[in-house]
């Protein structure tokens, strides 16, 4: 049996933009993606701490060092610049494969700069 577990998360990132006319996704600073071990086009869940909205989309890479956290397409209706969000990536494995699994947590400041990776 496969179990679904948290692989990684970017904790309390600040939304920097919302682009309704873009085709979809969440644009994330390439440094954040790398630190969280999230691949471009990987499915992610986004939780908005300001309004409680939860959504599923996919990550796309924004310019490294830009601090970008931009909700695109329909997701742009669920967040506004300045909102705080948690970006979560999940994976599956057997009980044996996951025995020693620990999720990667990337903590950021209000400018979306990495302050700690646990």
Curated annotation (Swiss-Prot):
Active site (catalytic residues): 25 (schiff-base intermediate with substrate), 58 (proton donor)
Catalysed reactions, as listed in the record: L-aspartate + H(+) = beta-alanine + CO2
Cytoplasm keyword on record: yes
Cofactor note (record): Binds 1 pyruvoyl group covalently per subunit.
GO biological process, one term: pantothenate biosynthetic process
InterPro entries associated with the record: Asp_de-COase-like_dom_sf, Asp_decarbox
UniProt GO cellular component terms: cytosol
Keyword line: Autocatalytic cleavage, Cytoplasm, Decarboxylase, Lyase, Pantothenate biosynthesis, Pyruvate, Schiff base, Zymogen
Class in the EC hierarchy, top level: lyase
Claim: DNA repair is one of the keywords in the record: no
UniProt cofactor(s): pyruvate
Record PTM Pyruvic acid (Ser), positions in chain: 25
EC number: 4.1.1.11
Predominant location: cytoplasm
Subunit structure: Heterooctamer of four alpha and four beta subunits.
Record PANTHER family: ASPARTATE 1-DECARBOXYLASE
Alphabetized HAMAP family for the sequence: PanD
Membership in a protein family: Belongs to the PanD family.
Function: Catalyzes the pyruvoyl-dependent decarboxylation of aspartate to produce beta-alanine.
Annotated NCBIfam families: panD (TIGR00223)
Protein's UniProt name: Aspartate 1-decarboxylase 1
Species, as recorded: Gloeobacter violaceus (strain ATCC 29082 / PCC 7421)
Gene that this polypeptide is encoded by: panD1
């Amino acid at each position: 049996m496969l179990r679904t577990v948290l692989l990684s998360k970017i904790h309390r990132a600040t939304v920097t933009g919302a682009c309704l006319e873009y085709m979809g996704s969440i644009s994330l600073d390439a440094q954040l993606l790398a630190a969280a071990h999230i691949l471009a086009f990987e499915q992610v869940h986004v939780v908005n701490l300001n309004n409680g909205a939860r959504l599923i989309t996919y990550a796309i890479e924004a310019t490294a060092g830009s601090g970008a956290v931009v909700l695109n397409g329909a997701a742009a209706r669920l967040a506004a610049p300045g909102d705080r969000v948690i970006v979560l990536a999940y994976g599956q494995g057997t009980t044996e494969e996951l025995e020693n699994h620990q999720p990667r947590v990337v903590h950021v400041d209000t400018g979306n700069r990495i302050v700690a990776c646990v």
